[in-house]
Amino acid sequence: MNLSNLKPAEGSTKTRKRIGRGAGSGLGGTSTRGHKGAKSRSGYSKKVGFEGGQMPLQRRVPKFGFKNINRVEYKAINLDTIQTLADAKNLTKVGISDFIEAGFISSNQLVKVLGNGALTNKLEVEANAFSKSAAAAIEAAGGTVVKL
């Protein structure tokens, strides 16, 4: 045995299917594609959402709603969260930078303070928006509301 007469092991390789090479090959004629129809044609690719001519689901279901391009999204932060943050870091002024540092928001998010919980400290709170109950609770505790 040498490099010039090496052969693959018996049964380890298959001869590839040569289609469309005449009737004598056994794979001529329709070339394993069956008769007619889109799948037998060259360049065929199934379109996304195509259901064989049936009205596709996307067109059967009615349209509804829209995305309001003027919508302003706020990240909600409650008073009890602000209180725990102020206690942990011994703060008298709580602002956007403190929320970012604590990981409550990312740098491009807007903050709305909501009135869930209670404040015990006198705090100056900076945010983009406040609910009426939150603003009242902050001022009742002797603090100030700074709307950015």
Curated annotation (Swiss-Prot):
GO terms for molecular function: rRNA binding; structural constituent of ribosome. The keyword Iron-sulfur does not apply. It comes from the Bacteria. Pfam families: Ribosomal_L27A. GO terms for cellular component: cytosolic large ribosomal subunit. Residues 21-31 have a biased composition (Gly residues). GO terms for biological process: translation. Residues 1-51 are annotated as: Disordered. Gene3D superfamilies: 3.100.10.10. Keywords: Ribonucleoprotein, Ribosomal protein, RNA-binding, rRNA-binding. The keyword Chloroplast does not apply. Belongs to the universal ribosomal protein uL15 family. Part of the 50S ribosomal subunit. This is Large ribosomal subunit protein uL15. It comes from Bacteroides thetaiotaomicron (strain ATCC 29148 / DSM 2079 / JCM 5827 / CCUG 10774 / NCTC 10582 / VPI-5482 / E50).
